[in-house]
């Protein structure tokens, strides 16, 4: 995988943390970058600036301290509102603006945003033209292969994007109707890669170093967008980068290393969100980290009732201490990839 450029920025590698609402907040972005991601993208920010006064929106728009280049995803269906939102985020420190035309969630699509936009190619063009003209930073785009299997217009949208001045394109290998079911279709991504000259990033079902290599070979993509597989496993970027570079698989992480990363992540969440919201946000992340370990279900039932930061950290330490002593986890005390 050769070096990838997005406008003036050369990425450390072509492995990108996909934007995920409720997941890719600043603590998670910073952690994934530390653990090997070449670029990390913010949670989706609505283009409706009248909603920016909520605490959730304000937290999503904190870019100071983010690893550079700072990529911020915006979502909406009105060209002028998206252009204004892009301009405002650049003023707040965004160095790359990413437009969401890939989210399949009903609450997004029902507002004629996300992958719903793929139904209207003229509107797609108007949005891309408006946002590119509004800012002097690179604009990127995330799409799906189409609205449904009968309307797979990803190739057409990719060409529209290139002509509009989009500087990189991420393609999830499913239609909006597919949601996350079935297998990702990499042949369509390969066709898109052949049809445009801008960088193309493949997305969908990339959950191991071996799968990463397969997808790169199958699509010819310039890089990979990794989302759900990084939840509870932010070191997947390091694993994939090492495998692609050397052909060798890194040893599974020691439990002690998983504990260290998780506690660091917890502390960052508690600081970023404050004690009350931080405790709530931490619960899902802890569930993801521990999902494959024995006793995790019982632990989560107890952990999710905890109400303060110190108790959360103490319980995580206790969980790992018990696993460390347990023969169930094996002599090496490693976490399977």
Language model features with spans:
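Alpha/beta catalytic cores of nucleotide-metabolism and tRNA/nucleoside-modifying enzymes
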Residues: 1-3, 7, 11, 15-16, ...
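Glycine-rich, positively charged N-terminal anion/phosphate-binding segment
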Residues: 2-5, 20-95
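Hydrophobic faces of well-ordered beta-strands that scaffold small-molecule active sites
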Residues: 15-19, 40-42, 70-74, 97, ...
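Active-site beta-loop-alpha junctions enriched in small/polar residues
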Residues: 20, 45-47, 75-77, 102-104, ...
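Non-cysteine beta-strand/loop elements that form the S-adenosyl-L-methionine
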Residues: 42, 96-104, 163-173, 226-229
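Active-site beta->alpha loop and helix N-cap motifs at the rims of alpha/beta catalytic domains
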Residues: 69-139, 144-152, 161-162
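Glycine-rich tight-turn/loop motif centered on a GG-T
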Residues: 106-123, 174-186, 248-251
């Amino acid at each position: 995988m050769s070096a990838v450029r997005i406008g003036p920025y050369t990425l450390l590698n072509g492995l990108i943390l996909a934007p995920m609402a409720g997941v890719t907040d600043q603590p998670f972005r910073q952690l994934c970058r530390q653990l090997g991601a070449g670029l990390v993208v913010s949670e989706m920010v609505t283009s409706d600036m009248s909603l920016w006064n909520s605490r959730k929106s304000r937290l999503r728009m904190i870019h100071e301290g983010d690893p550079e280049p700072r990529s911020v995803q915006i979502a909406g269906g009105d060209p002028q509102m998206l252009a204004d939102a892009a301009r405002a985020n650049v003023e707040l420190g965004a160095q790359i603006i990413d437009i969401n035309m890939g989210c399949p969630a009903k609450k997004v699509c029902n507002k004629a945003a996300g992958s719903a936009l793929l139904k209207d190619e003229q509107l797609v063009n108007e949005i891309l033209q408006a946002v590119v003209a509004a800012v002097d930073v690179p604009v990127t785009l995330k799409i799906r292969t189409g609205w449904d299997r009968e309307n797979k217009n990803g190739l057409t949208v990719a060409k529209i994007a290139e002509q509009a001045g989009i500087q990189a394109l991420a393609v999830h290998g499913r239609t909006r109707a597919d949601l996350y079911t079935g297998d990702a279709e990499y042949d369509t991504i390969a066709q898109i890669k052949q049809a445009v000259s801008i960088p193309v990033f493949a997305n969908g079902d990339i959950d191991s170093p071996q799968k990463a290599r397969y997808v790169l070979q199958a699509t010819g993509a310039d890089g990979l967008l990794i989302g759900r597989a990084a939840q509870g496993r932010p070191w997947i970027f390091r694993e994939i980068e090492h495998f692609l570079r050397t052909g060798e698989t890194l040893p599974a992480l020691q439990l002690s290393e998983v504990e260290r990363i998780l506690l660091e992540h917890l502390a960052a969440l508690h600081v970023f969100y404050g004690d009350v919201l931080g405790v709530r946000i931490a619960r899902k992340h802890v569930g993801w980290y521990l999902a494959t370990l024995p006793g995790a279900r019982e632990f989560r039932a107890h952990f999710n009732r905890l109400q303060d930061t110190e108790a959360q950290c103490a319980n995580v330490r206790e969980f790992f201490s018990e696993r460390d002593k347990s023969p169930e986890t094996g002599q090496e005390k490693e976490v399977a990839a």
